[in-house]
């Protein structure tokens, strides 16, 4: 079991290690995690999705639906951020239109039927694969497959949770 940083003999130690050594070991651990993400982005997406689904078990339906819609809006905005970083007008237009479309689906989920929200997540997974294959927005190569799997697992899991309520 890891212990937090504690004062010991006038200096800080972490599990008996000096601060510099502890910092190096922590950086190496983070580096290994990041390397795993780039080698296995689909597994990372599935894992992140499975980590984010349990909150919908404890949230009441009146909160779960808007929360999922807000996260969908944030997810859609990530690609707009990549487009802004990219700087090309055509990419910004494509990403901007897509973000507006996903925001519209999130709002439709709030206004008419919550089932628009998991459907939008599933469609966003398709959009992710289009990025991976067709759209040349500047972004990390691991991001589209990670996000696609996240979206599909989350859409399926959210649908299952809402059906079982």
Please report, for each region that a protein language model flagged, where it lies by residue.
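Cytoplasmic-side transmembrane-helix entry/capping segments in multi-pass membrane proteins
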Residues: 41-42, 90-100, 142-148
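Structural signature of hydrophobic alpha-helical transmembrane segments
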Residues: 59-73, 112-122
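Juxtamembrane boundary at the C-terminal end of a transmembrane helix
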Residues: 157-165
């Amino acid at each position: 079991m890891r212990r937090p940083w504690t004062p010991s003999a006038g200096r800080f130690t972490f599990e008996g290690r000096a601060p510099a050594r502890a910092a190096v070991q922590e950086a190496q651990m983070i580096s290994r995690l990041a390397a795993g993400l780039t080698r296995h982005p689909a597994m990372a997406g599935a894992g992140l999705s499975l980590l984010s689904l349990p909150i919908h078990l404890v949230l009441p339906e009146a909160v779960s639906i808007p929360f999922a819609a807000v996260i969908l809006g944030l997810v859609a905005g990530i690609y707009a951020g990549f487009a802004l970083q990219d700087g090309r007008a055509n990419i910004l237009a494509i990403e901007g239109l897509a973000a507006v479309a996903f925001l519209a689906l999130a709002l439709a989920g709030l206004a008419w039927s919550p089932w628009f929200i998991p459907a939008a997540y599933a469609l966003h997974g398709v959009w992710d694969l289009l990025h991976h294959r067709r759209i040349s927005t500047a972004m990390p190569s691991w991001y589209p497959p990670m996000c696609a799997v996240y979206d599909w697992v989350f859409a399926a899991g959210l649908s299952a949770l809402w059906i079982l309520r």
